[in-house]
Amino acid sequence: MKAIVFDEAGDESVLRVGEVPTPEPGPRDVRIRVAAAGVNRADLLQRQGGYPPPPGASEILGLECAGVVDAVGADVHEIAIGERVMALLSGGGYAELAVAHAGAVMRTPDGFSDAEAGAFPETFLTAFLNLFVIAGAREGRTVLVHGGGSGVGTSAIALCREANVRIFVTAGSEEKCRRCLDLGADAAIDYRRQDFEEEVKQRTEGRGVDAILDHIGGAYLEKNVASLALEGTLVIIGGMGGRRAELDLGRLLARRLSVIGSTLRGRSDADKREIVRAFLGRFGAALRDGRLAPAVDSVFPLERAGDAHRRMASGEHFGKIVLKVG
């Protein structure tokens, strides 16, 4: 089968279409004939040599895909060949065929295009896991999400809008802030012109937010902690702004704050199954009824994966970048 491969770590130019062996599903696996695959920041890091796949995972890029079930393992009874599905992957999405654990597969809603389905699993499940499961977001609470125009950010806005959670976001331009507000954010802070810590204090009358979802890391740590309400939770899912920072632990102790690091890719199949189950239990009706959908920025053919990576690296995108495969 055809897939995007690279012989050595490097910039976007190392990506090329190559022939690789067709993957075979295990007893609890589903094989998908891929129609579309989402592009995520982790793909760029892996291409650069900084984020290797977990043991046993495909070395092919791609943490989510959508398409039609092509084959199922002997112990899979809940999903049938021929069904349209979207799946969370540990790797392998940039290919004509991909294998996913059955527990990480969701049926594609009738109204979704292939591009929307391919853009959905990784970012919506990341936002759900970290805001709703780990940080306990619920109606009446307030959260801050950095990178409101990213795939995770736009997904978080959609989930919070559906759950009546007040959501503030940061974004890097007036235009992105406007689009975040159009999606349903309660406040959008242009981090290039505004101090998000001060904005949070003003908008919460000094209380702070109950949870923060952050992909920046070190550069934002002190200001994130200062922006939390009593017993608030900071969930860090990336380190784009550095991995090291100094922090006054007295503030954590005095305000009983939690700082948690979180990833999705390396979790066990059992963990991912439970995350999908919990997501569908909480938001399945909204998904089926068309109240949840990803914001798709752009769609590139598979052979232009390098251009898709350049688009993401530029920071100009709003929402998800998708590869059209089938």
Predicted regions and their residues:
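Mid-domain Rossmann-like dinucleotide-binding core that forms the NAD(H)/NADP(H) cofactor-binding site
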Residues: 119-193
